[in-house]
Amino acid sequence: MSRSNGVIDAWLQRQWYAEAQPPWGLRALSRGFGAAVALRRGYYRRNAKVSLGVPVIVVGNLSVGGTGKTPLVIALVELLRQHGWSPGVVSRGYRGSARAPLEVFCGSDPAEVGDEPLLIRQRTGGPVFVSPRRVEAARAVLAAGADVVVSDDGLQHYALPRDVEIAVVDGVRRYGNGRLLPAGPLREPVERLASVDFVVCNGGEPGPGESVMTLEGRTAVRLADGERRPLAAFAGQRIVAMAGIGHPARFFSHLAALGLNFEPVAWPDHHAYSPDDFRSVPEDTPVLITEKDAVKCRRLDDPRIWYIPVSARLDPAFAPRLLNILERFRHGQTTA
């Protein structure tokens, strides 16, 4: 993302999460966007969708920016495996250059496949395919042996059939000013949540009926050699913390809650890291980054860089509900 785009994004974020009313021009564009969203969803609801013959779980959100979808997808893959399923993941591959269904490997180029799909493959080791056409990616993942499809960030991709919809909500920022793009952060109206199967609240206070998810990460891993160190070991040191994710404040808050003192550096989401980003950091100063950023920094070979793996801990009631839905599918009962 260019510097000018980063400035625009920061300005929009201020509009979306401020109490003041956004400018009239943004509100007018928002009404047009809302009409287009309604037409598109109506079209796909009226027209029959292709059946994939296996259950499809869609994980997404209403808001643009990071809400914690990727850790949840990883947790879902692990949960499904524990209960005898063979999950495969499909994604558009944000900012990736792939146009046809492309399998993601642990050594894939994030510029080609996207950083989230690459992280999912590295963490789970299971089949991950990316394509702007998720139905094609789903067929590819089924051919690779999957018997359940998990779609990363596919809530608004209505061409893809789905049996379970999971919407992730930022429990602190919630829905901002509650407006649709570009006047607000929403891709769809809040009322859309009434039709999903699960609303998962990441941090903050959950609303009625929402499942709770917390992200846990107390260990740092040196990018250059894999050395692991408790984050508490960095207490009292001079530290730089960098994040090029949708909501960097969450990462910084996590470090602060662990008692670390650091200089925060926020980059635009999906920032492409280069050695220049670290030139101003003193040679003896550790740099803490997110696990998602780490997939784009592996070629830098900089011993100062440490990343923090996080894992999603889910509400105890979540797994039985999800598995019950999938078991009905296994016994020939669709969830539609």
Curated annotation (Swiss-Prot):
Keywords attached to this entry: ATP-binding, Kinase, Lipid A biosynthesis, Lipid biosynthesis, Lipid metabolism, Nucleotide-binding, Transferase
Any one GO biological process: lipopolysaccharide core region biosynthetic process
Known pathway: Glycolipid biosynthesis; lipid IV(A) biosynthesis; lipid IV(A) from (3R)-3-hydroxytetradecanoyl-[acyl-carrier-protein] and UDP-N-acetyl-alpha-D-glucosamine: step 6/6
Entry keyword annotation includes Nucleotide-binding: yes
Gene Ontology MF terms: ATP binding; tetraacyldisaccharide 4'-kinase activity
InterPro entries, sorted: LpxK, P-loop_NTPase
Annotated positions binding ATP: 63-70
Catalytic activity: a lipid A disaccharide + ATP = a lipid IVA + ADP + H(+)
Enzyme class label: transferase
Enzyme Commission numbers on file: 2.7.1.130
One GO CC term, this protein: plasma membrane
Family matches, as PANTHER family: TETRAACYLDISACCHARIDE 4'-KINASE, TETRAACYLDISACCHARIDE 4'-KINASE, MITOCHONDRIAL-RELATED
Purpose: Transfers the gamma-phosphate of ATP to the 4'-position of a tetraacyldisaccharide 1-phosphate intermediate (termed DS-1-P) to form tetraacyldisaccharide 1,4'-bis-phosphate (lipid IVA).
Protein family membership: Belongs to the LpxK family.
The protein's name in its UniProt record: Tetraacyldisaccharide 4'-kinase
Organism this protein belongs to: Methylococcus capsulatus (strain ATCC 33009 / NCIMB 11132 / Bath)
Lineage of source species: Bacteria, Pseudomonadati, Pseudomonadota, Gammaproteobacteria, Methylococcales
